[in-house]
Amino acid sequence: MNIRPLHDRVIVERKEVESKSAGGIVLTGSAAEKSTRGVVLAVGKGRILENGTVLPLDVKVGDTVIFAEGYGTKTEKIDGKEVLVMSENDIMAIVE
């Protein structure tokens, strides 16, 4: 996959998790919630500050992250694979 995000954008592949009810039944389709965890596939060079300085991103390729899914998150299909394009601001944590 050749994709290069610009500035403070990050490309994330969602990690699907198996959803189970309290009784152990596997939930599918609309009953299952989408995961807000993913693996970083690509990162931009950084956020450009008002003075022109480039502030490097905290996340790096290979990091597992927890993200907020909302207005700023865009879903794209690249080479048949669904990925998320988001700003680093939409990433809430890095899982270590």
From Swiss-Prot:
GO cellular component entries: cytoplasm
PROSITE patterns the UniProt entry points to: CHAPERONINS_CPN10
Protein keywords: Chaperone, Cytoplasm
The species this protein was found in: Vibrio campbellii (strain ATCC BAA-1116)
Predominant location category: cytoplasm
Subunit-level organization: Heptamer of 7 subunits arranged in a ring. Interacts with the chaperonin GroEL.
Lineage of origin: Bacteria, Pseudomonadati, Pseudomonadota, Gammaproteobacteria, Vibrionales
The protein's role, per its UniProt record: Together with the chaperonin GroEL, plays an essential role in assisting protein folding. The GroEL-GroES system forms a nano-cage that allows encapsulation of the non-native substrate proteins and provides a physical environment optimized to promote and accelerate protein folding. GroES binds to the apical surface of the GroEL ring, thereby capping the opening of the GroEL channel.
BP GO annotations: chaperone cofactor-dependent protein refolding
Pfam assignment, any one: Cpn10
Protein name: Co-chaperonin GroES
Subcellular location: Cytoplasm
Family of this protein: Belongs to the GroES chaperonin family.
Molecular-function annotations in GO: ATP binding; metal ion binding; protein folding chaperone; protein-folding chaperone binding; unfolded protein binding
